[in-house]
A protein has these predicted regions:
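Key residue(s) within conserved catalytic/signature motifs
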Residues: 4, 22-341
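C-terminal end segment of the histidine kinase catalytic
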Residues: 13-17
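DNA-binding patch around the recognition helix
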Residues: 1-12
Length: 341
């Protein structure tokens, strides 16, 4: 067995000393104050984490339109998972234009966090013994002679070997220590990363592994991504669960506004105005509230919010956030689709 010594400095992160309970519950403080309308989904994700902690791997997809709150939900879930000291977490993200240019981009980003984070030495040792084709992707962590040794080991390595090695490495790492692996914006994923995820989801061995993917279904269709077929096949075989985020209702918007107003009473009709104009999209909702504040339509008075003009005189127009998102979607269309629009 070879020992691998770090070249780069690894900063340790202190971990809680409390032990994890057998059952996972979601306390109210798991989510930020402005986290609304997603409590039931968060509870289901927590239940999936409970299964992963018991050794049953979980493959989950959180889907929804742009601005619907996928990343906010993931943040809240990771905050919940961080309360368990044995749970290791890593997060990678696909980047528009990188799918097909840099193979395994989101996985390498997540692994990069693991080889530099808490218990990094263990991760490097496992990669050295189980997945040298992946360890070589982080040359800054190795001495020159170690890099040369790895290069000899992986000479002639195939894509199939890389898939097998990372699956085996993650299973070794999660045999006793749970891992939450989050990969975002998977509508831009590269085919090689999908091969790894497909293999991880289908393998039957025990693993304390929870994989959580986020993506926009419309983008998957527009880009003709193979992710759609993979997800459907895994769902059919009960190897994947999908959580599609719906738009917020008026009660959710009201709860958000009250949280922003520190619990103060809201002007009559304000929640309906914001809900109607945002159509329940959390990103647009937040943008509308900012515009109301910046334009002076809402002011803080005696600790609460007060309208400076009647609701029917407030002209919200099209928020910059919405306009930019629409422009991006139009830019992605081909000429025929633009003509139809």
């Amino acid at each position: 067995k070879r020992g691998y010594q770090f070249v780069a400095t690894v900063k340790a992160v202190a971990e809680p000393s409390t032990t994890a309970p057998n059952a996972v519950t979601v306390p109210e403080e798991s989510a930020p104050a402005t986290f609304v309308g997603r409590g039931s989904v968060l509870s289901e994700l927590a239940a999936c984490l409970d299964k992963a902690l018991s050794g049953t791997r979980q493959f989950l997809c959180v889907t929804g339109e742009a601005g619907i709150g996928k990343s906010t939900l993931v943040d809240a879930f990771q905050d919940h998972a961080s309360r368990y000291p044995d749970v290791r977490q890593a997060r990678g993200q696909c980047v528009e234009g990188f799918g097909g240019k840099e193979t395994y981009y989101p996985l390498l980003e997540a692994l990069g966090q693991m080889v530099r984070g808490p218990r990094a030495a263990e991760v490097v040792e496992v990669l050295a013994s189980q997945a040298p084709t992946w360890l070589i992707q982080f040359p800054a962590l190795l001495k020159a002679e170690q890099r040369e040794d790895l290069q000899r080991q992986i000479l002639g390595a195939t894509r199939e070997r890389m898939v097998r090695e990372i699956c085996e490495a993650l299973e070794v790492l999660t045999a006793n220590s749970p891992l939450v692996l989050v990969l975002e914006d998977m509508h831009w994923v590269d085919p090689s990363t999908l091969d790894v995820l497909s293999a991880l989801a289908r393998r039957r061995g025990r693993a304390k592994l929870l994989m959580l993917l986020t993506y926009r279904p419309v983008e998957v269709i527009l880009l003709n991504s193979p992710l759609k077929a993979l997800k459907q096949e895994l769902v059919v075989h009960r190897l994947c669960r999908e959580f599609n985020l719906e738009r917020l209702n008026e009660a959710d918007v009201s709860a958000y506004l009250k949280a922003e107003a520190a619990g103060a009473e809201l002007p009559a009709g304000l929640a309906k105005l914001v809900h109607d104009h945002s159509e329940g999209n959390p990103l647009f909702m937040a943008a509308i509230v900012r515009e109301l504040q910046e334009s002076g339509a809402i002011v803080i008075d005696d600790g609460g919010w007060r309208l400076t003009k009647p609701l029917d005189e407030i002209d919200l127009g099209v928020q910059d956030t919405l306009q930019q998102m629409l422009e991006l979607q139009v830019d992605q269309m081909n000429e025929a689709e633009r003509q139809i629009l």
